[in-house]
């Protein structure tokens, strides 16, 4: 008797476009490559304590409309230029959404938002948007969720995040060890920082793991380790952005032999998932920075053209410039928040 034991739960397998096809169709322009190189260098200097500016990763929770994303980028670029002496502003350009259960997984996975899962289209749209943003002079940041998409997009990312659900994952630590950009690891969803500290140490070491080449072939990858990794405080069972929390994290980092540097996420559990509270978190963190706290090297903010969020499932037409995932602050608050951060950096300098 013949037993069929393989692919029992697989409905269909489609070929994925090889990375090289996308890299040739949308090659990095000299301007885009220059934007990435300079931003990575600036972030490296901030992490090494050679630049006292604040890294600000700010933008929509997720990208679903490239047109609105480009308008946001144009507005943000003007503020980046204006506040460049105090802030290193990088746009949050998230294409992939880790879900606690199920839901829309982002522009790459389902670009047409209709459960058609045209991933090849998603990769094309994502790379073209990243290219346009970088070409304008605005650097981009993203979250890395798998081992394959970085081959399509990572050359256009100036900073990367590993999320709270994946910080403990071995494959994500291995991936971070080979990424060309600085990487932030979020504390665990329960608020523990040990997983992020372990992740920073792991990603700083060389690794050998499986991935794909630019030609789309399965490959064995050897990395040299990433020395530009840091922790992101995003809250847990309670917020963890206060001066008391920062002091505890600094102590934990020192004990682990790591530099006392933290980035604070104003959203997620730190805002108790209430988007307007990001402004309260900002006020508290600005007070710490203005008071001379040098350990706070960066912040993360969820912001869009229009405040709040909307449901993709409602069947209603989508409002322009409004998030379809986590709720974000609107543009007016964004402008005020960035100026507040810049003033705090000025005060820290005395």
Curated annotation (Swiss-Prot):
Keyword match Amino-acid biosynthesis: yes
Catalytic activity: D-erythrose 4-phosphate + phosphoenolpyruvate + H2O = 7-phospho-2-dehydro-3-deoxy-D-arabino-heptonate + phosphate
Pathway: Metabolic intermediate biosynthesis; chorismate biosynthesis; chorismate from D-erythrose 4-phosphate and phosphoenolpyruvate: step 1/7
GO MF, one example: identical protein binding
EC number from the UniProt entry: 2.5.1.54
GO annotation (BP), single: amino acid biosynthetic process
Miscellaneous notes: There are 3 DAHP synthases, AroG is feedback-inhibited by Phe. The other 2 DAHP synthases are Tyr- and Trp-sensitive, respectively.
Subunit structure: Homotetramer.
Protein name, as recorded: Phospho-2-dehydro-3-deoxyheptonate aldolase, Phe-sensitive
Source taxonomy: Bacteria, Pseudomonadati, Pseudomonadota, Gammaproteobacteria, Enterobacterales
